[in-house]
């Protein structure tokens, strides 16, 4: 494992073999690749945390684009290379697309985040020239008990203050964390997964439906909408990812016969909430 804090990683992951790496600062320690057949590259500055100041946007771009470039450069220097590179991307690649069905071959948007995704994935795909199969995992809104989007949503909903964002018509390409892991492993093991793969549930919902379902799961009312201008005032440019409508669908995963553990939203939320000690 490579990360910013290898000591913490070893403690948290049971003594895993961990190495220090700052993604945007240069090559990786080559000893980390010894005997490895698959590389999972998941590192990067969090996109949905904090306002997108100039410094934040620079950190997002450099950690992903430069980090991936540094990774591929290190792979090029190896005498024996891994066979597969799986790189995390995000559904922000597609931008705000209304009710359009979004598959892996849909065109990118021209927003800041989409442009980062295009550059990020392009750097990853250069590993094909080194003989690696490359999968870029465009990940949606992750539902997990202790990470992803859900824990940040819960406090107002628990108080009965939850509500839809704007008019609630925007599509949310959600995914349970167990299926994120499952799809990353599926990408690593499946030769037919080559290029982009949407890491999303086969059943996206609108924000209105999501809000209602989460309220029902918590047995709380969820009727206080958050206006678009309020999100813009609170989060600035970053609010675009909260309001973007992305009806992304997992065509590649389904065509390669991935079996979703949580294809429906309510069981996914119940599974997360059952592990939440504060519920």
Regions found by a protein language model. Name each.
Residues 125, 154-163, 170-204:
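Alpha-helical substrate-binding/gating segment
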Residues 57-59, 69-111:
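Conserved Rossmann-fold NAD(P)-dependent oxidoreductase catalytic core, especially the SDR/UDP-sugar
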Residues 240-279:
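C-terminal amphipathic/interface module of NAD(P)-dependent oxidoreductases
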Residues 89-90, 122-145:
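Conserved beta-loop-beta element that borders a ligand/cofactor-binding pocket
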Residues 118, 130-132, 143-152, 187-197:
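Glycine/proline-rich active-site loop of Rossmann-fold NAD(P)-dependent oxidoreductases
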Residues 190-237, 270, 276-279:
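Mid/C-terminal beta-alpha module of Rossmann-like enzyme folds, strongest
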Residues 4, 10, 16-67:
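NAD(P)H-binding glycine-rich loop region in Rossmannoid oxidoreductase-like domains
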Residues 143-145, 169-178, 197-217, 263:
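Substrate-binding strand-loop-helix patch
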